[in-house]
């Protein structure tokens, strides 16, 4: 499993949530849940209105960190509703890195 790509896909969804006006706490909670569903042994998520940071520890003991700077934010409740459903889908089905990347990139 390519954990870097998985992390990118999770971060893509978080970025789309932040750009759509989701609350920081809701984004953190969604990202925590997605990280947990992939079996990461540790995951730290930090969200502020212009930045998302995620550090994970893989089951192999590798530590990865990715950071995104978000420049534009608006409010789109329809997209947020879709992204929340998408987050639940990811947690329930843990799509592979290719599918997750396609899902996440479709909304960034």
Annotate the PLM regions:
Residues 1-95:
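Soluble N-terminal domains of membrane-associated systems
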Residues 106-108:
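Conserved small/polar residues in nucleotide/adenosyl-binding loops
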Residues 102-104:
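Short, compositionally biased segments
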């Amino acid at each position: 499993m390519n954990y870097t790509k998985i992390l990118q896909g999770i971060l893509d969804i978080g970025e789309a949530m932040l750009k759509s006006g989701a609350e920081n706490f809701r984004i953190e909670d969604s990202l925590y849940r997605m990280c947990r569903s992939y079996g990461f042994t540790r995951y730290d998520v930090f969200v502020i209105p212009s930045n998302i940071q995620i550090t994970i520890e893989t089951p192999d003991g590798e530590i990865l960190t990715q950071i995104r700077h978000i420049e534009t934010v608006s409010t789109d409740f329809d997209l947020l509703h879709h992204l929340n459903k998408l987050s639940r889908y990811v947690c329930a089905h843990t799509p592979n890195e290719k599918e997750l990347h396609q899902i996440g990139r479709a909304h960034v």
